Structures are given as structure tokens and as C-alpha cells.
């Protein structure tokens, strides 16, 4: 673990920007509307009743007391998104708020931070709670008054919600610690760079983020699930994901004489269409292998065959064993497909992330935490997705579980992540804070 770079309570802070008033975005006819920034966010109790258990009711009260603050903080982060490994402002905002609560955040090299709450007793390990903080290089089209102020960058995957929810959970746990009511040791992990391969989690582990940790938990926004509900799954919940790069070179020339060229455009077309089919014959189809191209670049003139072209994409597998073999199989398939065309080839498979494989015991704890704070019907079974998540690297070191936090207005429009129009029901922040705090309490008492 690096030497502490704690932020003092008196450190200068940019604070949270005030949210301008606005009439908001016109609702879709016939669908419930997400409240605009000019309107207060309804309390979570508009969806779920506060439990009778005194301890859980107290946790509800502590989280609810900061509802407006955490919503404002989330909107501030949404308005000021930062790409992977540049989350300097986000790190300062979170660190300053933790320091103001009397805590001692420790900055990671570059960006991101961790913060311990409570003391380890009897040699018991800490429980880690993780949120990612980075945004995406996508224009923000959500239409909210707190939309991104950074051109071409948006919180289109809900990491602003993750950050606010974890901060709310951490402050509630700090309240319990200050009152002498916290009997578990917790570590908050505010992680940078989830959206780039192989992910910021590797740097967090290298900096000692999992040292002394026995279990780790996280939530990820799911706009297909109603707010107040959480999707859980034992075993793999995401896929493995690698980035692939193909570059072809050869003699270019006039389009009237392709036989005098290597025609890299035609060869690229063969790679695009044929390699996915080849993979389906060389890898077990039950592994759910999926090759999807994201970019193709070649040429600039209609009557000239270019001398070079490139492809990039993602290679995903549901099964970790297939993932371990996929890079070699992919590279061989590309070479076999382009061999007849006489082009020079460079092919690279950049290792990304393994599947997130949820530990059974940890997932049962998450289920219990969700039911405790959100009600007996709040847990829903979720499917394994083809999305990648670098939380999977943590689970190669430490048992844990990730769940999907519902963000959809009940009965409302279903948005999707990695799209600039993503909008969330901000009651999810309060729900996420409660679930994270409660699972830490349950896990620490085992």
C-alpha cells in the first residue's frame, strides 16, 4: 500500500455546483416522467416502506438525511464528466467530502482513492465496496439542465450514480462509526478507468486496494430494471471482453485495375464477414463467443484502392475457458482468411477483462441486504450479459459479488447504457447507498 496521501478536512474543494432550475424535458406521452432538476427527488419511501427493524430503520434515516446532497453531487458529476485516467476533479470532490466527514481518504497514483471506515478486530478482514468513476467519449443528449458541460464526454454508463451511491453509503457508515455503532471494518474503493482495457481495477490492486480485504461488493446501474429492485446472479454475470486490432497493407492502385493491387478493402470485408463465422467453428458455440467490429478505416477516394486499412472491435466470451483460448484462435482465423489476398497483416488481441463470477456466499449476502432495506420482493434474477466489467479482476483475488441496480422509472421508458440519452430515476442513489451499506454490515458480522 502506498504512503497515505490523506486529504485534510481543510483542503480546498471545488464543491458541488448549484443545479440551475429548468422546466426539464418534455415527457414521452403516456409514460411516467423522470423529475427535472427543478423538482425535488421523491424519497425512496415513495416506493418501499421503512422496515420495522430498528437497526435497518436507522440506516434508512442516515441515508435519507443526505438524499438531496447525494443527488446534487451526482448531478454535479454528471455535468463534469471525466474520461478514464483523467478523473482528477471527481477524485477531489469525493476526497474532500470524505475528509469533511472526518475520514482519511488515500489517493491512488493518478486518480481514484480508497477510504477505510472502522477498525479491524480479531483479525477479521475488511469488506470492500467499489464504485467506478469514469465517463465515456459520447455526446450527452439526455436533455437535462445538468447535462455534460464537456463536449463529447458523458456519464452514459451510470458511474456518476455509482459514485454518489457509494459516497452516501460510506457517510452513513461513518455516522455509525462516530456513534460507536459500527462493528465492522469497511473499505470504500472509488476506482478510475473502468471503461478502458484492461481496467483500472488492476491499478487499484497494485496500490494495495484489496490488502486485508475478505470480500468485495459493487452495484452497476441497469436501466432495464425498475428503481427499487436489484438484479442478482450466482456465477458469471458478465462476459470476458478483449479488444482486437487488425491492420492490412499492400500495393494500392486504380479501382479499374484491382488485379494489380492487394485490394485491402476487399480483404477487410472478408475479415469483417468471415472471421466471426470461423470463430463459431473453432470455439465451442456454448461459450457464447461474440466478435463485433466497432470501426473500419480505409481509403478516401472512390476510384483509388488504398494501401492500408484497419479494423477494431471487441471479442467477448461468456466462458472463461474459451476466453483463455480466444486470442490465439482469433489471430489464426484472421491470418487464414486474408492469406489468399497477398496483404501484409498485423493482428493483435489486447487482453481485457475476465467475466465477473459472483461467489455464491457473497451473492446470498447481497440478496439478504437488498431484502432487508428494499423489501422482500426487491431481488430479481438477472441474466449473464455480454458486457465486460473490470470488477472481474477483483474476484480473481477476493470473493465477492456485483448486482444490477434498477434505475428505470416504474412503467417508464427503457433507456440503455453507453447511449447519450441515458436518464435515471435518482431514487436509485438512495437505494444503492442502502444496499451497499447493509451488505457491508452483514458481511462484516459473519
Regions found by a protein language model. Give the residues of each.
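Intrinsically disordered, low-complexity proline-rich tandem-repeat tracts
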Residues: 2-45, 54
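Metal-dependent amide/peptide-bond hydrolase catalytic core
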Residues: 40, 44-47, 51, 100, ...
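Acidic/His- and Gly-rich active-site-bordering loop/insert found
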Residues: 41-155, 160, 164-184
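Divalent metal-coordination and catalytic microenvironments
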Residues: 77, 129, 159, 188, ...
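Active-site beta-loop-alpha junctions enriched in small/polar residues
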Residues: 82, 132-134, 193-195, 222, ...
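Histidine/acidic-residue-rich, glycine-tolerant segments that coordinate divalent metal ions
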Residues: 112-114, 136-138, 143-154, 160-161, ...
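Non-cysteine beta-strand/loop elements that form the S-adenosyl-L-methionine
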Residues: 128-130, 139, 244, 402-408
Amino acid at each position: 500500500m502506498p504512503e497515505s496521501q490523506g486529504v485534510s478536512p481543510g483542503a480546498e474543494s471545488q464543491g458541488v455546483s448549484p443545479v440551475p432550475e429548468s422546466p426539464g424535458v418534455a415527457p414521452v406521452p403516456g409514460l411516467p416522467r423522470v423529475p427535472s432538476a427543478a423538482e425535488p427527488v421523491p424519497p425512496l419511501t415513495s416506493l418501499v416502506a421503512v422496515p420495522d427493524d430498528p437497526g435497518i430503520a436507522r440506516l434508512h434515516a442516515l441515508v435519507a438525511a443526505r438524499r438531496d446532497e447525494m443527488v446534487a453531487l451526482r448531478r454535479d458529476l454528471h455535468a463534469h464528466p471525466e474520461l478514464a485516467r483523467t478523473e482528477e476533479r471527481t477524485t477531489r470532490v469525493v476526497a474532500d467530502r470524505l475528509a469533511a466527514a472526518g475520514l482519511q481518504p488515500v489517493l491512488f497514483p493518478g486518480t481514484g482513492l480508497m477510504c477505510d471506515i472502522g477498525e479491524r478486530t480479531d483479525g477479521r478482514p475488511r469488506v470492500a465496496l467499489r464504485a467506478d468513476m469514469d465517463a465515456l467519449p459520447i455526446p450527452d443528449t439526455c436533455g437535462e439542465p445538468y447535462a455534460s458541460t464537456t463536449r463529447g464526454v458523458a456519464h452514459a454508463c451510470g458511474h456518476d450514480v455509482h459514485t454518489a451511491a457509494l459516497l452516501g453509503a460510506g457517510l452513513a457508515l461513518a455516522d455509525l462509526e462516530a456513534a460507536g455503532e459500527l462493528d465492522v471494518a469497511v473499505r470504500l474503493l472509488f476506482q478510475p478507468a473502468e471503461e478502458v482495457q484492461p481496467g483500472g481495477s488492476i491499478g487499484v490492486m497494485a496500490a494495495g486496494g484489496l490488502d486485508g480485504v475478505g470480500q468485495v461488493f459493487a452495484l452497476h446501474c441497469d436501466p432495464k430494471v425498475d428503481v427499487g429492485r436489484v438484479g442478482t446472479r450466482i456465477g458469471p454475470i458478465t462476459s470476458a471482453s478483449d479488444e482486437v486490432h487488425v491492420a492490412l497493407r499492400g500495393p494500392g492502385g486504380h479501382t479499374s485495375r484491382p488485379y494489380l493491387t492487394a485490394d485491402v478493402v476487399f480483404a477487410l470485408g472478408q475479415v469483417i464477414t468471415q472471421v466471426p463465422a470461423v470463430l463459431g467453428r473453432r470455439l465451442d458455440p456454448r461459450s457464447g463467443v461474440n466478435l463485433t467490429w466497432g470501426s473500419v478505416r480505409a481509403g478516401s477516394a472512390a476510384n483509388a484502392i488504398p494501401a492500408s486499412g484497419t479494423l477494431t472491435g471487441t471479442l467477448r466470451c461468456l466462458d472463461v475457458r474459451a476466453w483463455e483460448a480466444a486470442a490465439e484462435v482469433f489471430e489464426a482465423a484472421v491470418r487464414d482468411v486474408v492469406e489468399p489476398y497477398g496483404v501484409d497483416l498485423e493482428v493483435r488481441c489486447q487482453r481485457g477483462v475476465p467475466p465477473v463470477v459472483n461467489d455464491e456466499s457473497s451473492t446470498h449476502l447481497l440478496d439478504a441486504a437488498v431484502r432487508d432495506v428494499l423489501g422482500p420482493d426487491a431481488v430479481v434474477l438477472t441474466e449473464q450479459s455480454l458486457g465486460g466489467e473490470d470488477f472481474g479482476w477483483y474476484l480473481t483475488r477476493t470473493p465477492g459479488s456485483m448486482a444490477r441496480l434498477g434505475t428505470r422509472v416504474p412503467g417508464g421508458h427503457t433507456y440503455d447504457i453507453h447511449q447519450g440519452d441515458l436518464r435515471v430515476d435518482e431514487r436509485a442513489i438512495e437505494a444503492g447507498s442502502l444496499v451497499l451499506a447493509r451488505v457491508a454490515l452483514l458481511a462484516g458480522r459473519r
